[in-house]
């Protein structure tokens, strides 16, 4: 209040104090975030000017939100260490943590996710969503991030039309 702005920090599905029985990796969460944004706008009205920011899965969610139609009160997006899509992130973790290839587990898990939650791992794509975003976006990523590999931010940055900025933080991990 002292600085003249408000901060809304909602928990995504099945995280923090939020309800839900499964983390949705940002894909269904993007719709929840848009509802929160609209609620904030209803509360603050004409004075609303919004920056949408997220870290890690929240960053992927932020980018997934960015590809949806945006009301005039949204001014820009800030993503910090978000992944390209769920398929890429899960494939990387399957290999890194368990030494397993994509086939057959990724294909089975993708199919089960489609059946249970109505979306697939490749559909849940920050990469496709940022390509549709025409508002400014600031990308932040550590050059030592091995959880969400730094290479992912370069793909995301390349896919996003101008205006955009990229900051690779030297020595920073996830």
Predicted feature residues:
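Conserved alpha/beta-hydrolase
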Residues: 2-19
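Alpha/beta-hydrolase fold nucleophile elbow
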Residues: 44-56
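Hydrolase active-site cap/lid region
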Residues: 64-120, 128
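Catalytic histidine neighborhood in serine/cysteine hydrolases
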Residues: 157-174
């Amino acid at each position: 209040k002292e600085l003249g702005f408000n901060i809304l920090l909602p928990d995504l599905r099945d995280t923090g104090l939020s309800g839900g029985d499964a983390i949705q990796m940002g894909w269904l969460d993007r719709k929840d975030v848009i509802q929160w944004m609209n609620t904030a706008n209803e509360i603050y009205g004409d004075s609303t000017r919004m920056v949408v920011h997220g870290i890690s899965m929240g960053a992927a969610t932020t980018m997934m939100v960015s590809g949806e139609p945006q009301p005039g009160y949204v001014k820009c997006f800030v993503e910090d260490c978000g992944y390209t899509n769920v398929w890429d992130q899960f494939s990387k973790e399957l290999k890194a943590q368990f030494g397993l290839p994509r086939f057959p587990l990724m294909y089975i898990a993708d199919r089960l996710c489609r059946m249970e939650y109505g979306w697939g791992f490749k559909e849940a794509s920050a990469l496709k969503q940022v390509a549709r975003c025409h508002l400014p976006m600031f990308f932040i990523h550590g050059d030592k991030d091995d959880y969400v590999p730094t290479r992912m931010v370069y793909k995301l940055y390349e896919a996003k039309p101008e205006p955009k900025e990229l900051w690779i933080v030297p020595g920073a991990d996830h």
